[in-house]
């Protein structure tokens, strides 16, 4: 049996045409202060932030931006707030300032379609195998843990990818350099949350009994089951099917993945 579901929720009014009403605040920065929020005409689970455009690779990048004014950095030192190895963001209104006017809609946490597939297979006499898959297609997740473990700040427990951060010897990297605390909410930490999970497998076998044995025991069955046995995902975190906050959908702040469990049972029926 295959099930499919779709849910669409749009904000119709918040009292203002342009205002974003925050539902989850950025714990490490006040610009912008929110990551999730309600805005008229947008999904209920809308994600907001700056559009991350990598880092300044070389002086030529900085010089060319003097003409185009396409990008801007978060700290206003140097030419137009730029600096080699620092992150750059899309300057939406081309005013040379990184502020609320550059915050954009980064996607909805709601999946396009979700559901499951399950079936039971009877093999020979007494053996049955049941499988159950769940899935979610589309939608985005915000990896809040990257504000701590994927920034250039001098703090412990960094993600391995930070070994590839920008340096003079690695000038093509789009990961901000060490020593720069990149804690702004941006598209850098927004990921496709699609997944397919083998939720459970159940195997049962009924042992054949002779007529004589059935006078004492009517049935003996053995069972083996497992939960959360396999997960396919695009998300680089542990598991996109997690949530840290009860206020918003799909926010990962170092959440533990769903545990894998096994069970064995013997059933005797007299």
Where are these regions (language model features)?
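Residues that define the transmembrane beta-barrel architecture of outer-membrane proteins
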Residues: 111-115, 194-199, 258-262
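Strand-connecting loop/turn motifs
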Residues: 124-126, 217-219, 259-261
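Extracytoplasmic gating/loop element in the C-terminal half of outer-membrane beta-barrel translocons
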Residues: 70-72, 81-84, 136-227
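C-terminal beta-signal and terminal closure region of outer-membrane beta-barrel proteins
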Residues: 22-57, 158-159, 163-165, 170-171, ...
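Outer-membrane beta-barrel pore domains and translocons
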Residues: 3-7, 134-136, 223-229, 269
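Repeated loop/turn-to-beta-strand initiation elements of outer-membrane beta-barrel proteins
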Residues: 126-129, 210-211
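Conserved small-residue
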Residues: 1-107, 227, 234
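Transmembrane beta-strands of outer-membrane beta-barrel proteins
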Residues: 129-131, 218-224, 264
């Amino acid at each position: 049996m295959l099930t499919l579901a779709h849910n669409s929720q749009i904000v119709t009014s918040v009292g203002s045409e342009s205002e974003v009403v925050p539902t989850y605040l950025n714990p490490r920065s006040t610009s912008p202060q929110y990551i999730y929020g309600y805005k008229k005409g947008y999904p209920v689970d809308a994600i907001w932030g700056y559009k991350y455009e990598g880092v300044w690779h070389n002086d030529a990048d900085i010089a060319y931006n003097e003409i185009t004014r396409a990008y801007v950095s978060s700290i206003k030192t140097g030419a137009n707030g730029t600096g080699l190895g620092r992150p750059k963001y899309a300057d939406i209104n081309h005013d040379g300032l990184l502020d609320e006017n550059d915050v954009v809609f980064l996607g909805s946490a709601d999946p396009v379609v979700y559901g499951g597939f399950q079936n039971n297979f009877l093999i020979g006499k007494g053996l049955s195998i049941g499988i159950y898959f769940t899935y979610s297609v589309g939608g985005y997740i915000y990896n809040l843990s990257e504000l701590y473990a994927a920034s250039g700040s001098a703090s412990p427990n960094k993600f391995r990818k930070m070994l590839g951060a920008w340096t003079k010897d690695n000038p093509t990297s789009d990961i901000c350099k060490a020593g720069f605390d990149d804690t702004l909410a941006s598209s850098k930490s927004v990921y496709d949350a699609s997944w397919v999970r083998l939720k459970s497998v159940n195997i049962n076998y009924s042992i054949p009994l002779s007529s004589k044995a059935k006078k004492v025991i009517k049935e003996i069955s053995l069972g083996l089951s497992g939960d959360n046995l396999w997960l396919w995902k695009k998300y680089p975190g542990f598991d996109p099917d997690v949530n840290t906050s009860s206020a918003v959908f799909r926010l990962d702040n170092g959440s533990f993945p769903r545990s894998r469990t096994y069970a064995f049972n013997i059933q005797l029926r007299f």
